[in-house]
Amino acid sequence: MRFPTVILEGKKLPRMIFSVQPQASGGDQKIYPLMKEAYEMGAWCFDLPSANHLKSLKELKHLSTDEALIGLCHVEVETGASFLGKPLHRFGSKIISTIRRGLLPSNLTRNVLPPSSSPEVFTQKEIDRIAFDPPRFEEALSFFDPEESPFLFMGEIYGDWLLALGRIDLLHEMVSRVRGRGFIPIFSGQWATFVLPKAKPLDVAAYAVPINKKWSLFDLQRASDLIKKFEKPVISLNPLADGTLLNESEGAFSFLFDELKIVAAVPGIASPGEAKTLVEALMKFPSLIPPRKT
């Protein structure tokens, strides 16, 4: 069975990229068996959010001898930023307090930011002193291989936070390093209506944000309108709204692929049955063929 595909920067991606998420009782030991069953249904690209996912892909690639089998690894941009020589994650609570106090409307931060234990906030001078950390970022990239993961998700929650702090220059530097290592970057964020306009100048192949038929941050209608007009490719994270749309997956994909013109989706699967349901729904949709140059 051949999945419909999309082409980004000359490389093919399936329009559905499984994120293997076994139930807690099975844990990481069930990643490989479930990945293998999805592969046997036709999946040839997997979301790889952890070292155990990458290990499972390596094992499957070795045993199947399938050179076309690939994954999408994740690099957290926090690994590329430091403050006063210390990793930025040590100042996470201070960043949250800073964003909460003035960089986003209070009605939004209440719902999307974790609680902060810090009464302190960054001054503008301190924000300006957040620096790119080449050794840590290069070390993070060294765990990945462009042959296994030609595309690389980069951003995560610290990507949103750096954009909120006005430090897109750090993201530009990290994108350049990712490309220098031979990867094709895909920027991933959590706050769709905030991230897409702010991150638009980045030299990335696509943008990945949580959006589905039920919700998106900060507002589904605004996010939908923005994506419809967005000039660059968008990938849907959490396309089934935490599994609540599984039994109406064809409609969920139709909303994304037909209405919003989203190029691909990354649904989570916890069982072979879920994978089968999604494969059957996906086959109703075509590949995206780039226009022929004249």
Cite the ranges covered by each PLM segment:
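Residue-level detector of functional hotspots within protein domains
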Residues: 2-4, 32, 123, 138, ...
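Beta/alpha (TIM)-barrel catalytic core signal, keyed to glycine-rich beta->alpha loops juxtaposed to Asp/Glu
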Residues: 17-22, 27, 51-56, 77-81, ...
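Generic preference for well-ordered secondary structure
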Residues: 2, 30, 41, 121-128, ...
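Active-site beta->alpha loop and helix N-cap motifs at the rims of alpha/beta catalytic domains
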Residues: 65-165
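N-terminal binding-site loop/beta-alpha segment at the start of enzyme catalytic domains
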Residues: 1-69, 255, 259
